A protein has these predicted regions:
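GH16 jelly-roll
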Residues: 1-155
Length: 155
């Protein structure tokens, strides 16, 4: 996975992080993200800049940019619903290219307003009141260096 520190794709501005056994935490304000709007935060397993790709290309599980690569959706949300999920790909070829990915995602977690256990929505009556900023933490589990699952919690 690479994180961008710029508004456009520039391979010199990406850096690789390993999330296995780690976590990602962030604060989010979804108060103005209503129905029909998706606020997204996701990570993709882009090839390293030193790979044989020329020019360096963006990729994701939907083949945006012309290439497939693994994707993890940390957040597809608005003030009424929240979704996380992982998109696996087949094994990469010798050149590091993937020929297909799961575009719908696996291990999906959907949190909807009035779902009970999660108590999420735009009102003070909800435990997670999306009219105000809240914190999200996603922990990535691994065994022997392989992704085995994740949990996402709100505070």
């Amino acid at each position: 996975m690479y994180l961008s520190t710029v508004e456009k794709i520039d391979p010199s501005k990406y850096f690789k992080v390993n999330l296995l056994g780690g976590s990602v935490s962030f604060d989010i304000d979804l108060s103005k993200s209503g129905c029909g709007c998706i606020t997204a935060l996701y990570a993709v397993g882009m090839p390293a800049a030193e790979n044989s790709f020329s020019p360096f290309q963006y990729c994701d599980a939907s083949k945006t940019g012309g290439y497939y690569c693994p994707e993890f959706d940390l957040m597809h949300a608005n003030r009424h619903a929240y979704r996380t999920n992982a998109h696996r790909c087949d094994a990469p070829s010798a050149t590091g290219l993937y020929s297909s990915c799961d575009t719908t995602g696996q291990c999906a977690v959907d949190i909807l307003q009035n779902e009970g256990d999660y108590d999420y929505g735009p009102s003070y009556i909800y435990t997670i009141n999306t009219q105000k900023p809240f914190s999200v933490n996603t922990v990535f589990y691994e065994k022997d260096g392989e992704f085995t699952g994740y949990t996402t919690t709100f505070v």
